Amino acid sequence: MPVRSGNITVTTQILATYPSYPGIRSFHPEHGRFLAETDLMDMERVVVLGRKIAERLFGAPESALGREVLIFRARFTVVGVMEAKGRDLTGADQDEQTFMPLSTYMRRAANQTWISGVYLHLDERADLDQVRQATGAILRARHHLEGKKDDFSMLTPADSMQLRKEALDLVQTLGAITSTISFAVGGMGILSIMVLMVQA
């Protein structure tokens, strides 16, 4: 999603969320503040920028506070800049995200009535399998999936790590295959030249 300030436009991932997000993700503002309950209730046009987005648009991250950016052809005021965090378990760069109130996104920006994902923060004593089953049951009921396959997926941090490992293994395997093919083609080329030289 493009975000613009003056003549500068950068691409960002918009994350529409609640004020509880920093506590759930252990990811907090370095400058300014995060989204407040009043922002959510009043559908305020405010955003919190990831560090890299703030740097690309305004230079020093702290200079982004109070400035306006253009998203969805609407003006939003920057109220905070997040701390540097790097990539998450899925490989997404969290410093290139932009946060806005969920209500603002759904009603004023995207005009949609559904959400694409939810983070759950579990108590250490919680049974992960029970939580997964209960969450799945709620989603299946809400999505009217009786007798049908799930139209959603649930990932734990361990699942994300496994998916990332499998993706890296696939890349390494493809790299090894490519190297082998290149070596074989190169060997055939050398053999052809040697045969030609012998025939000559």
Regions found by a protein language model. Give the residues of each.
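Short, well-ordered secondary-structure micro-motifs
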Residues: 4-5, 89-91, 164-167
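Mid-to-C-terminal secondary-structure elements
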Residues: 13-39, 43-148
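Short strand-coil-strand connectors
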Residues: 4-8, 72-74
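A hydrophobic alpha-helix feature that marks transmembrane segments and, especially
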Residues: 172-200
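Peri-transmembrane interface segments
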Residues: 119, 146-181
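Short, hinge-like loop/turn segments at secondary-structure boundaries
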Residues: 10-11, 171
